[in-house]
Regions:
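Membrane-embedded catalytic cores of phosphoryl/pyrophosphoryl-handling enzymes
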Residues: 117-209
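Short, Lys/Arg-rich, polar N-terminal cytosolic tail immediately upstream
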Residues: 1-22
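Core segments of transmembrane alpha-helices
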Residues: 34-36, 94-106, 125-126, 145-151, ...
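Helix-coil boundary and interhelical linker segments in multi-pass alpha-helical membrane proteins
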Residues: 39-57, 104-119, 155-165, 201-209
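Membrane-helix exit/interface motif
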Residues: 73-77, 102-110, 129-137
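Juxtamembrane helix-capping/reentrant segments at transmembrane boundaries
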Residues: 81-96
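The first (N-terminal) embedded transmembrane alpha-helix
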Residues: 25-45
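Alpha-helical transmembrane segments of integral membrane proteins
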Residues: 22, 26, 54-62, 91-95, ...
Length: 209
């Protein structure tokens, strides 16, 4: 049984409407979409974080487009398609690391605002924490949960109490969809979310003016 058919089989436990809704939630809350939303919301509501449109475009390119390039790249690289979903995840991890590292270097060399640098540090350290947990400690953490929790935590930081309820609702929907589709266990989702929280906390210590 292929990985795709196994995944489909696990979804058959849910009603068709429930599974379809869960797939839609996961599709619209992929990490690149969330960081894109984060950057656009901040650009139009906290304009002082950005020195100009160029800072926004660089942020979108490095935090959104570079990670997204992993998917077409997997189809272009010889033999990579045969590695299945696991190979796609590994390539996505590499592209995330490349994009987030480049964003951090861009921020350090161009002296972006403290708020924008906090975002760059959070994304860079989130990959480092996931690498430590998944590859070194062998404690499986959901990269999807980490990629969702990160921008939601940042939104709560920038908007205070006003951001907590909507962000909590989004994260609850993501958890529900992942559990419904059996993509992750509750423990993997929790560890992934805590990874984002740890990365954000470390970033506060590093990037605070």
């Amino acid at each position: 049984m292929t990985e795709r058919s196994q995944r489909k089989a696990t979804e058959e436990g849910a009603s068709p409407a429930k599974a379809k809704t869960a797939r839609f939630v996961r599709a619209v809350t992929v990490p690149p979409a969330l960081v894109c939303a984060l950057l656009l919301i901040l650009f139009f509501s906290r304009r002082s974080l950005f020195s100009g449109v160029a800072a926004l475009l660089w942020s979108l390119a490095l935090l959104v487009l570079v990670p997204l390039f992993a998917y077409p790249l997997a189809a272009l690289l010889p033999g990579w398609e045969k590695k299945g979903r696991e190979g796609e995840r590994n390539l996505a991890f590499v592209m995330n690391f490349a994009g987030y590292t480049a964003a951090l270097l861009y921020g350090l060399f161009t002296r972006v605002s403290a708020g924008l640098l906090l975002i760059y540090w959070t994304y860079f350290l989130s990959v480092a924490v996931l690498l430590l947990l998944n590859k070194v400690i062998r404690l499986r953490a959901s990269g999807h949960a980490c990629g969702i929790a990160g921008p939601l935590i940042l939104l709560c930081w920038f908007f205070g109490w006003a951001g907590i309820l909507p962000c909590a609702a989004v994260f609850a929907a993501v958890v529900w969809s992942s559990l419904t589709l059996k993509r992750h266990t509750p423990r993997e989702l929790l560890v992934g979310a805590l990874s984002a929280a740890a990365a954000f906390s470390l970033s506060l210590l590093i990037a605070s003016p």
